[in-house]
Amino acid sequence: MLRLSNAAVITTNAILALIGLAALSFSVYVYVQGPSQCQRFVQNPLIVTAALLFFISSLGLIAALYGSHIIITLYLFFLFLSILLLLVLSVFIFLVTNPTAGKALSGRGIGNVKTGDYQNWIGNHFLRGKNWEGITKCLSDSRVCKRFGPRDIDFDSKHLSNVQFGCCRPPVECGFESKNATWWTVPATATTAIIGDCKAWSNTQRQLCYACESCKIGVLKGIRKRWRILIVVNLLLILLVVFLYSCGCCVRKNNRVPWKRRFF
């Protein structure tokens, strides 16, 4: 059992350390080259995550190879902390991406201690002020609407993502006529005033409907969809960390066994 625990800890942490080092190297490379607007959103979280992954994995390798009681204890402490953080993150993501659960828990509490506004958290933090300006620049830089060429007249029949449907074309209720996928005009028979999102629409490729409320709704739906996937990823990570924690406990329990007997 001891040999299996050591082998599992060494193999898994070696792989994770390489992944962390590769991610850290990529982050530094992007920083040196000058990140785009989209890359700025993930650069700092990626650097921190990669550095922590490399650090904890290195601790695991040292703990399994040399059996230092202090290092093993420190390694287990960080693993336990990681489990707690992943659980909290998963619950938080569930609350902010599930309107029913978010609404049920928003503003609850005892006395002056109240929970936050989970129902509108994503909208309040991403769809306002400088954060939204950064997102619109990211959408423009990433050319999310460029998959449709000027001659692509079959625009409506394509499978559009929430972001593309809300940001790359005027709202359906505007009644605009499409000359092609990148150019829309007001019909000559239009009788209603051009207001709201219809007025915000621009045929300029760096503007389009990025200033529309429909674009914010599309981005909000896109964030919720991807964050729900992140919950599944977090749960898989929790299982992996629990496995490593169990193996680490076994290594710690038997760390007085002579070094050679751990592998032979």
From Swiss-Prot:
Principal location listed in the UniProt entry: membrane
Any one of the GO BP annotations: auxin-activated signaling pathway
UniProt membrane topology term: Multi-pass membrane protein
InterPro entries, per database record: TET_plant, Tetraspanin/Peripherin
Residue numbers on the Cytoplasmic membrane side: 1-13, 67-75, 250-264
Any Gene Ontology CC annotation: membrane
Pfam families linked: Tetraspanin (PF00335)
Subcellular location: Membrane
Primary role: May be involved in the regulation of cell differentiation.
Family: Belongs to the tetraspanin (TM4SF) family.
Name listed for the protein in its UniProt record: Tetraspanin-12
